[in-house]
């Protein structure tokens, strides 16, 4: 069997690939995730996903390497992972009662070519109270997640509805990723 590598240390991406019953190994890429040039959110996630995959694929050229990057976008502004609880609260206030997009760039590099794509999911939040925001922040859950929330955790209660791929919001558009890996010959 050909080697499949996830170029990510994300526990959520690991769980999703395990859900698909795939045999893979994890080799985090440890790249600089800053985008120094001006890019659209779509271009930014695609570029970061490619950089992550390429950093690993350069050392494993005969393997299939998956790189991914996920961001939350509200009114054309990228909301990354909050650095402080205050920043998390500000992000959640922005998202409260509004719609936003979750974008995941995916790069699959293989001996048979590559697949690069961006998956976009629209998420609608209920109006949140200050108590809900602070109770959620007190759990610590929002601190390592883009947009300061994880749909698969307690923040599921904030989501009114979504349009698109649920797993994309978790961190990896699973079915499309698996189909692309197989299309490339894995």
Swiss-Prot record:
Tell me which residues are marked as the site Important for substrate specificity.
12, 70, 152
Name the gene behind this protein.
Answer: maf
Which major enzyme category is it?
hydrolase
Catalytic reactions on record: dTTP + H2O = dTMP + diphosphate + H(+); UTP + H2O = UMP + diphosphate + H(+)
User: What's the source species for this entry?
Assistant: Geobacillus sp. (strain WCH70)
Q: Could you tell me what this protein does?
A: Nucleoside triphosphate pyrophosphatase that hydrolyzes dTTP and UTP. May have a dual role in cell division arrest and in preventing the incorporation of modified nucleotides into cellular nucleic acids.
Q: Report the cofactors.
A: a divalent metal cation
- Protein name per the record: dTTP/UTP pyrophosphatase
Primary residence: cytoplasm
Q: Which HAMAP family match?
A: Maf
User: Carries keyword Ribonucleoprotein?
Assistant: no
Keyword annotations for this protein, in alphabetical order, are: Cytoplasm, Hydrolase, Nucleotide metabolism
Recorded hits in PANTHER family, A to Z, give: BIFUNCTIONAL DTTP/UTP PYROPHOSPHATASE/METHYLTRANSFERASE PROTEIN-RELATED, BIFUNCTIONAL DTTP_UTP PYROPHOSPHATASE_METHYLTRANSFERASE PROTEIN-RELATED
């Amino acid at each position: 069997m050909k080697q499949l590598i996830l170029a990510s240390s994300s526990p959520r991406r690991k769980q999703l690939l395990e859900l698909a019953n795939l045999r893979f190994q994890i080799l985090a890429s440890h790249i600089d995730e800053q985008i120094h040039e001006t890019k659209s959110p779509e271009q930014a996630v695609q570029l970061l996903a490619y950089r992550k995959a390429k950093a690993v694929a350069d050392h494993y050229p005969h393997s299939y390497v998956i790189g991914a990057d996920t961001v939350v976008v509200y009114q054309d502004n990228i909301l990354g992972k909050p650095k402080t609880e205050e920043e998390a609260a500000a992000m959640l206030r922005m998202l409260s009662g509004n719609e936003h997009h979750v974008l995941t760039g995916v790069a699959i590099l293989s001996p048979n070519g590559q697949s690069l794509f961006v998956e976009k999911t629209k998420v609608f939040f209920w109006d949140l109270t200050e108590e809900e925001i602070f109770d959620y922040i007190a759990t610590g859950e929002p601190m390592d997640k883009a947009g300061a929330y994880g749909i698969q955790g307690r923040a599921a209660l904030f989501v009114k509805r979504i349009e698109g791929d649920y797993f994309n919001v978790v961190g990896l558009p699973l079915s499309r990723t698996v189909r692309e890996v197989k299309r490339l010959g894995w």
